């Protein structure tokens, strides 16, 4: 699962860079949780459902 979480974090980091978006803004808009990206960076592994939700948000807002 760790490799999946790392890949997911990489996707999020790429989105942040491509859209020049602050991590806190992304966290609030995508998950309604201000510390979401910080928690990912800290090593928390999201559930498959959470990753699906965030990927859908990125697709709709990309």
Per-segment meaning from a language model:
Residues 17, 31, 41-45:
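Residues in soluble alpha-helical coiled-coils and helical-bundle/repeat scaffolds
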Residues 1-17:
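A short, Lys/Arg-rich alpha-helix, primarily the initiator
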Residues 38-55:
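Short, basic-rich loop-to-helix N-cap that marks the start of a DNA-contacting helix
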Residues 2-3, 29, 39:
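Non-transmembrane "mature" sequence context
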Residues 59-62:
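Short C-terminal boundary/hinge segments that cap the last helix of small helical domains
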């Amino acid at each position: 699962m760790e490799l999946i979480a790392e890949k997911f974090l990489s996707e999020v980091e790429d989105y942040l860079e491509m859209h020049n978006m602050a991590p806190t803004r992304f966290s609030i808009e995508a998950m309604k949780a201000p510390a979401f990206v910080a928690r990912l960076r800290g090593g928390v592994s999201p559930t498959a459902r959470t990753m699906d939700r965030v990927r859908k948000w990125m697709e709709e807002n990309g």
